[in-house]
């Protein structure tokens, strides 16, 4: 037995205890994803419109189109901001519970209600469930550290998409194969939703959130006390000012950052896409089931394939969203053209939906909707990345909230003018004709923007920015560099980036009688007298790295190895007193 000693004990590292968050985050994320999956199991949702228009409820198509469905847009606009704020203030889980109870209320009204007012109240509760989706998508980030955000975001999104797909397939199988009535299908949906409410009761309530429940008080007090010690003042005015500033720092700082962020062209472009294209997308989604019923007004529930169309569109949307992550283009140049192409495709698909009339062509309507939804889902992750790539997490949430709010305003205005009975009250087919024109106008605007960007790019290519005293093109630069290498065989042509500087003997050999011939053959060299050219061509013993080169800070050697302009200007040669700038090409330093 080896006796223990203090020296030996000190050498043994003390293992840190396991982090409770590291031990439990997998279980919490798995439970939340299971809840997200079960909350989407609503097999009767794809068949709500034929249920309302069928013998069970016996509403007219005009009532559903112009009186019931428009309430969804109005109520969603009314509850969006309060639910968004309550989600963060109450720390997610109460809002998730509210969402589950609202879903239960929707299906209770759907089963027990018989008047237009009951159905309008149903739309109000459904708008609450839509606004509360932010609670699920943001709640998962409070469970893990930032390093795991990307992974858990993929898990939560996959759970939701899998739940929607499973729900649509299950509903279609029950209707087509099991010959289940729409009323029975809604009772099955109510049972699943009740189970999801029970699951929501056991969700862990996090201790922090993005805006209202942040641990900023300690940091503010620490900053104030440190600054008071550094710069004391009468009555602690500085500390008081900082404490006051900390009270409203979150809102004020985020508003300032939001104003600064709006100067970025990509952020403006994709935010505008989010506002206007999302508004048109959800209008199509809200009314497409009514259009399908008008194309094929069958009373045989087994011939209604709404669930299959929703399942296929969800699957295609998941595939296109996944594929969008592998698109590698220069977004600053091609974003508008990509958006214009996708929007023009959507305009054509909506036009096809509006002009399909024969019941045998219902499958064409299904296919057009599947492609329409897949094309929109293709751009959603691209827009998300382009908006969020340069923003903080808090500011990103604010930008998405603002974009969604303005999209809801646009959607509500269009709904009131086009669909509402107090507005034009158009039938569903004419509405889709207007929606196709809406997407067509958007695509034309995007195309014009892409053309203007292309013209600006071509103008910059034909007229590069150069100083007025400089008239040398890249071909003349290469010719002058080659003329220098001809005079000295030791150079052996243009030097690579790693070559050592020229010795004084080698560089002096480039100045002499041959220099006169070079000046006569090269019009640019002929502009400078021989003594001045000799002064310009005088060697330097250390490399002259490019001005403003990022590698210059680490030394001339690093700059020479990394600067791309040294392929034209060898190290150690100050060619004609010119230095290369990354942004402006070649600049005369002797002006």
From Swiss-Prot:
Family matches, as SUPFAM superfamilies: MFS general substrate transporter (SSF103473)
Record field: transmembrane: 30-50, 65-87, 92-112, 117-139, 154-178, 184-202, 267-292, 305-327, 334-354, 361-384, 399-422, 431-455
Resulting phenotype, residue 45 to A: Enhances methotrexate uptake
Biological process per Gene Ontology, one example term: organic anion transport
Effect of residue 400 to A: Reduces methotrexate uptake. Reduces IRF3 phosphorylation upon cGAMP stimulation
Effect on the protein of changing residue 133 to E: Reduces methotrexate uptake
Organism of origin: Homo sapiens (Human)
This protein's GO CC annotations: apical plasma membrane; basolateral plasma membrane; brush border membrane; plasma membrane
Domain notes: Has separate binding pockets for folates and cyclic dinucleotides. Two cyclic dinucleotides can be accommodated in the binding pocket and they are likely transported at the same time.
PTM sites of type N-acetylmethionine: 1
Name of the featured protein: Reduced folate transporter
Reported effect, residue 45 to K: Reduces methotrexate uptake. Reduces methotrexate uptake
PANTHER family: FOLATE TRANSPORTER (PTHR10686), REDUCED FOLATE TRANSPORTER (PTHR10686:SF12)
């Amino acid at each position: 037995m080896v006796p223990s000693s203090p020296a030996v004990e000190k050498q043994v590292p003390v293992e840190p205890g396991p982090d409770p968050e590291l031990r439990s985050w997998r279980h919490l994320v798995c439970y939340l994803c299971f809840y997200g999956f079960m909350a989407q199991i609503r097999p009767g949702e794809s068949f709500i419109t034929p249920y309302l228009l069928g013998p069970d409820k016996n509403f007219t198509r005009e009532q559903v189109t112009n009186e019931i469905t428009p309430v969804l847009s109005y109520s969603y606009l009314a509850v969006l901001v309060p639910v968004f704020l309550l989600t963060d203030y109450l720390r997610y889980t109460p809002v998730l519970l509210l969402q589950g109870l609202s879903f239960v209320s929707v299906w209770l009204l759907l089963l027990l209600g018989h008047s237009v007012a009951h159905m309008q109240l149903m739309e109000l509760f459904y708008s609450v469930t839509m606004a509360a989706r932010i609670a699920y998508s943001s709640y998962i980030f409070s469970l893990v550290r930032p390093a795991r955000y990307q992974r858990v975001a993929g898990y939560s999104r996959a759970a939701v998409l899998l739940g929607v797909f499973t729900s649509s397939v299950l509903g279609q199988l029950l209707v087509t194969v099991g010959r289940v009535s729409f009323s029975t299908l809604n009772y099955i949906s109510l049972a699943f939703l009740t189970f999801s409410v029970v699951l929501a009761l056991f969700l862990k309530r996090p201790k922090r959130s993005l805006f209202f429940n942040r641990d900023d008080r300690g940091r503010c007090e620490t900053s104030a006390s440190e600054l008071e010690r550094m710069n004391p003042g009468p009555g602690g005015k500085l500390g008081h000012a900082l404490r006051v500033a900390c009270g409203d720092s979150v809102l004020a700082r985020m508003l300032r950052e939001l104003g600064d962020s709006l100067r970025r062209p990509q952020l403006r472009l994709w935010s505008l896409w989010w506002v206007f294209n999302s508004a048109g997308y959800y209008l199509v989604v809200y009314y497409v089931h009514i259009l399908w019923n008008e194309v094929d007004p069958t009373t045989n529930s087994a011939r209604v394939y709404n669930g299959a169309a929703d399942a296929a569109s969800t699957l295609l949307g998941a595939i296109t969203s996944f594929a969008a992550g592998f698109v590698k283009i220069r977004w600053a140049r091609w974003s508008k053209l990509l958006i214009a192409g996708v929007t023009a495709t959507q305009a054509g698909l909506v036009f096809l939906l509006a002009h399909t009339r024969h019941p045998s062509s219902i499958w064409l309507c299904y296919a057009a909707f599947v492609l329409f939804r897949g094309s929109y889902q293709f751009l959603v992750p691209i827009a998300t990345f382009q908006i969020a790539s340069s923003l903080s997490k808090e500011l990103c949430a604010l930008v998405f909230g603002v974009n969604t709010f303005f999209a809801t305003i646009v959607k509500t205005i269009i709904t009131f003018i086009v669909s509402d009975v107090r507005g034009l009250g158009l039938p569903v087919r004419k509405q889709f004709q207007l929606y196709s024109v809406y997407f067509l106008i958007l695509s034309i605007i995007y195309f014009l923007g892409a053309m203007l960007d292309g013209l600006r790019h071509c103008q910059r290519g034909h007229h590069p920015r150069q100083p007025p005293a400089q008239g040398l093109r890249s071909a003349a630069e290469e010719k002058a560099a080659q003329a220098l290498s001809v005079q000295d065989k030791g150079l052996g042509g243009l030097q690579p980036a790693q070559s050592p500087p020229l010795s004084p003997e080698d560089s002096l050999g480039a100045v002499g009688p041959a220099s006169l011939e070079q000046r006569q053959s090269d019009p640019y060299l002929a502009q400078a007298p021989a003594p001045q050219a000799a002064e310009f061509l005088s060697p330097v013993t250390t490399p002259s790295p490019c001005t403003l080169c990022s590698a210059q800070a680490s030394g001339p050697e690093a700059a020479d190895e990394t600067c791309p302009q040294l392929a034209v200007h060898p190290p150690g040669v100050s060619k004609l007193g010119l230095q290369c700038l990354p942004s402006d090409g070649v600049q005369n330093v002797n002006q």
